[in-house]
UniProtKB/Swiss-Prot annotation:
Organism name: Ruegeria pomeroyi (strain ATCC 700808 / DSM 15171 / DSS-3) (Silicibacter pomeroyi)
Localization per record: Cytoplasm
Name of the protein in its database record: Adenylosuccinate synthetase
Cofactor(s) the protein needs: Mg(2+)
Binding site for substrate: T299, T300, T301, G302, R303, K304, R305
Gene name of the encoded protein: purA
Binding residue positions for IMP: D13, E14, G15, K16, N38, A39, G40, H41, T130, R144, Q224, T239, R303
Length: 430
């Protein structure tokens, strides 16, 4: 049985939630392998809108096992609230349908405070974080002072972990002008939340390996996008974890040989939230039109997204670093009505043509896009479910994208509704 990794191939917000939900019917297990609740998924199922941040997209599908892997950083208080919200919408969530890796790091209140304090004081070069503590939690994980889910089960261990973390954080807070952390209040909060988290705790690595040996199909769900990867993204304007497909293995505790297909999710244009380079960004009427038609506001923050033309040069990079086998092209319908469309095929850097975005931030800032123009289409593609439903110029656009990124289109999405999807290649096909 094939196991599939789904990754965002741009700067996030590509429509992964819909595609993961669409694929989840073919999967037995849906496992999230990185990120925190700073990334949001919006699912529309039978007219019901579900907004997920920490929970895997598979929770809204009955009879599936959803997993939060060790590569995720988890805010336990947020998770409890999100579970309650989704339950109120009629979704059953139990330890039989949701498992959390015992070695998953926890985001604590002081992580968010530190995140916001740094961002507020860094007036010269803001990163554009959501202020939810994701980065500081990952720092603690690497610094070997993070509190993990399993630590909630033993009072003595929990106290030791808290004391170790506070030695570091109180010194750091002093330099930022923040009050020391109230140790006793923190311990009380953790002891109160523990009974609501521990029933979901499990040795996820063991469960997933057993599922794989039993021939179950596993869908690995990433958050954000490959251009926000801590190593291969537009550093330092990136997230604090690896986002590329290779993280799926380490983020849940399964070998890389378990990955059979990597599906990259790609908008038919480009968007970005927050700071950082964006070569094809549009500050004109076309950019406004893309944002309005595409409803480009963040699920988590409500922040307006920056919009621009499709960047094939960047997509070639992410296809390489994630080993993408095929892409799901989303929001094709947003391009309806444009007389002319542009695709970035490379960059001009001080008179030299490049077919990739350089690593150095100063060079990224000096890159100007080299465009190829294509005719648009006046017909509507919204709701199309087969190639026959698409205008000729829309098909030409999709085919040109394939040629430029050297990767086939496996799926095309033409509306937020899950059924409005053109399937070219089933990623789960054996």
């Amino acid at each position: 049985m094939a196991n599939v990794v789904v990754v965002g191939a741009q700067w996030g917000d590509e429509g992964k939630g819909k595609i993961v939900d669409w694929l989840s019917e073919r999967a037995d297990v849906i496992a999230r392998f990185q990120g925190g609740h700073n990334a949001g998924h919006t699912l529309v199922i039978d007219g019901e809108v579900y907004k997920l941040h920490a929970l895997p997209s598979g929770v809204v599908r009955g009879g599936k096992l959803s997993v939060i892997g060790n590569g995720v950083v988890l805010d336990p208080w947020h998770l409890v609230k999100e579970i309650a919200t989704i339950r109120d919408q009629g979704v059953e969530i139990t330890p039989e349908t949701l498992m959390i890796a015992e070695n998953t790091p926890l985001i604590l209140p002081f992580h968010g405070e530190l995140d916001r304090a740094r961002e507020n004081q860094n007036s010269v070069a803001k990163i554009g974080t959501t202020g939810r503590g994701i980065g500081p939690a990952y720092e603690d994980k690497v610094g070997r002072r993070v509190i993990r889910v399993a630590d909630l089960a033993d009072a003595a261990t929990l106290e030791l972990r808290v004391d170790r973390a506070l030695v570091h954080h109180n010194a750091l807070r002093s330099g930022l002008g923040l009050d020391p952390i109230d140790r006793d209040a923190l311990l009380v909060s953790l002891r109160e939340i523990a009974p609501q988290i521990l029933p979901f705790a499990a040795p996820v690595w063991k469960v997933l390996n057993e599922k794989r040996k039993a021939g179950k199909r596993i869908l690995f769900e990433g958050a954000q996008g490959a251009l926000l990867d801590i190593d291969f993204g537009t550093y330092p304007f990136v997230t604090s974890s690896n986002v590329i497909a290779g993280q799926a293995a380490t983020g849940v505790g399964i070998g890389p040989g378990a990955i059979d297909y990597v599906l990259g999710i790609v908008k038919a244009y480009t968007t970005r939230v927050g700071e950082g380079p964006f070569p094809t960004e549009l500050d004109d009427a076309d950019g406004e039109r893309l944002g309005t038609r595409g409803h480009e506001f963040g699920t988590t923050t409500g922040r307006k997204r920056r919009c621009g033309w499709f960047d094939a040069a960047l997509l070639r990079q992410t296809c390489a670093t994630s080993g993408i086998n095929g892409i799901a092209l989303t929001k094709l319908d947003v391009l309806d009505g444009f007389e002319t469309l542009k695709i970035c095929v490379g960059y001009d850097l001080d008179g030299t043509r490049l077919d990739y975005l350089p690593t150095a931030a100063d060079q990224q800032a000096r890159c100007t896009p080299i465009y190829e123009e294509m005719p648009g289409w006046s017909e509507s593609t919204e709701g199309a479910r087969s190639w026959a439903d698409l205008p000729a110029n829309a098909i030409k656009y999709v085919r040109r994208v394939e040629e430029l990124i050297d990767c086939p289109v496996a799926m095309v999405s033409t509306s937020p509704e899950r059924e409005d999807t053109i399937l070219v290649t089933d990623p789960f096909a054996d």
